[in-house]
Each structure stands twice: as C-alpha cells, then as structure tokens.
Amino acid sequence: MLTSVVCTLFEGDYHLGAAGLVNSLHASGFRGRFICGYRGALPFWAESSKSEPNATKVRMLDGIEIIFVPLNPAIHFTNYKPTFLLEAWKEIAPDAPKIYYLDPDIVIKCPWDVMERWAEGGIGLCEDVNFYLPPRHPIRLAWHDWLRSQNIIPHASQRERYYSGGFIGVPIAARSFLELWRDLIARAADITGSLDSIKHGNPTSLFHTIDQDALNIALMCTDVAINASGPEGMDFFSGGSLLSHAVGSRKPWRGGFLTNALRGYPPSMASKAFLNYATEPIPIFSSLSLMRLKATLTLAAFIGRFYRRS
C-alpha cells in the first residue's frame, strides 16, 4: 500500500519541536515515512539511526521511518520548503501519493485519516492569523502588478483568503504547484535582495513573509482546489481540533512560562498542546524537567486569567 509522506525542516533547538511533531504523528495513527531536513548536528533522538547513502540517517520508530537529510542551503529554511518537498518526492519517496509539510513547531491533534482527507483532490491549507485578504486589497493589487511584470497570468484572481505557510498537503496531481511556489520564491529575491531571513521590509512590502506571500501569490496563479480550514485549524483561535502551531519566538520547549505570564503573555494553546506530546515514543525531556514545565505552565495559565496584555 502506498503511503503519504510527511516532511519538516529544522535547525538549532527546533529539533525539540520536531520530536513533538513525531510524537503527535504517532499518536494520530500515522505510520510511514517522516523526512527531516536538518542543518547542523543530528539531534539526540536520532542517535540510534543507521547510516544510509548520501549521509542520510534512518531511524525506525514503531512503524514510522524517520529519515534525516543533512542540508545547508544558502537561504533560510522557510524559503526552502517547496524545493525540499520536490527533492524529497523525487529522491526519497517517488511512490508517495501525497506529501505533507509541517513546521517543526506544529503538533497534530486529529486522527491521521483526517489529515489524509485534507489533501484529497486539492491542496490542504490552513488560514493564517490575518486570514482575510480580499481580491481588491492593496497588497493583492500590488501582487497583480508584480505578476504582470513577470509575465505571469493570475488565473484565480478572486482569491480572498490568506493562508499559512506552516502547513501544506499536496496530492501528486497538484505537484506542479510546488514548482510554481519555488519559482515565485526565487523571483522574490530580486525584490528582497536575499532569501536568508523570514521577514523582509514591513507589513506593506510586496514580500514581507517571503515564503508565505509567495504561496498565496501562487494560489492566485492556478485554479487548483483549496481544501482549507480556518485559523482555528492551527489554534490561532479557539475551537480548533486539527493542528496546533506555536508561532512567534516563545517556543514551548524553551519554557519561561512564568516569566512570560508576568509580562502579560500567558501560555498559548499551542504550548499546552506541545507538552501533551512530549513523552512518547520520543521522551523529549527528563521526567523532572517535564514535571517542572507542566507545573509552571499551569501556574502561568492561572496568572493569565487575571493579567494579560490587550
């Protein structure tokens, strides 16, 4: 039976988030290949991996085949996503009917069959925090002007939603969308000057969040079906049951819950979700460290009931 493939990219302490993603995949019922592109040293939870050609490492984990691929592109990992997905599909998983990408600060809360359905017959996406971007919004009009300068025709100019680049599910029939996304990111470098950072300029810049803006511009250039959830799909708003995305610099594996709460930033839903997937099959923390994290999160959440920044 052909199985879908899941990918992520990480460097630095984001390997702790990637371990939480693996644990959540396992809890969801996913069994198959999980491809990790990484920069720097292998994480501690990859130590039992076996060496394979091209310097890759493979670890089997109760039905999940974790493949570690060393990378060192000259651009920020977030701008490397479509390139990595295309390479993984071609070189590692050419038989996969679908490929998924999730940022390493995301965990999955739903059963895997829901994830499979999400990318059935269309591209699986989740709306971003700032999700409404109507067809005649000035930013979108600027994108239209830029597309004309690139001799690209926007076939779906009436898109009105703005989607997160932290998650995408692509069926094989829509594989060419990844090529378009990759191409637009490369063209964006002529505007931004480089692709070595997540952000560029200010919120009104043509490309502010480069990979994410390029993703949404690519959606204007194709009539591919979009299978989307609202922003609650990543726990940006309450009521979500699909994914949980710990956006921003306050990552749950770094702790600091009490300090942040006293500054008016209570623990996010994503912080709570991450700790739910911190124990198995990969123990991310020692028992004592996890107990402390959970205790401080509980206290910080209590403080947040009475004090938070508006």
How would you name each of these model-derived features?
Residues M1-H76, K90-D95, F285-S310:
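N-terminal anchoring/stem segment of glycosyltransferases
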Residues M1-L2, H155-Q158, R175-S310:
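A glycosyltransferase accessory/donor-loop signature
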Residues A18-A19, T78, P82, Y162-G165, ...:
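Conserved glycosyltransferase catalytic-site signature
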Residues A27-R31, K90-K98, D103, P171-L178, ...:
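Secondary-structure boundary elements
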Residues I35-G37, K98-D103, I108, G124-L125, ...:
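A structural signal for short, well-ordered beta-strand segments and their strand-loop junctions
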Residues L42-S51, P135-I139, K199-T204:
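Short, flexible/disordered intra-domain loops and linkers
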Residues P82-P135:
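GT-A fold catalytic core of metal-dependent nucleotide-sugar glycosyltransferases
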Residues D113-D183:
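Conserved catalytic core of nucleotide-sugar-dependent glycosyltransferases
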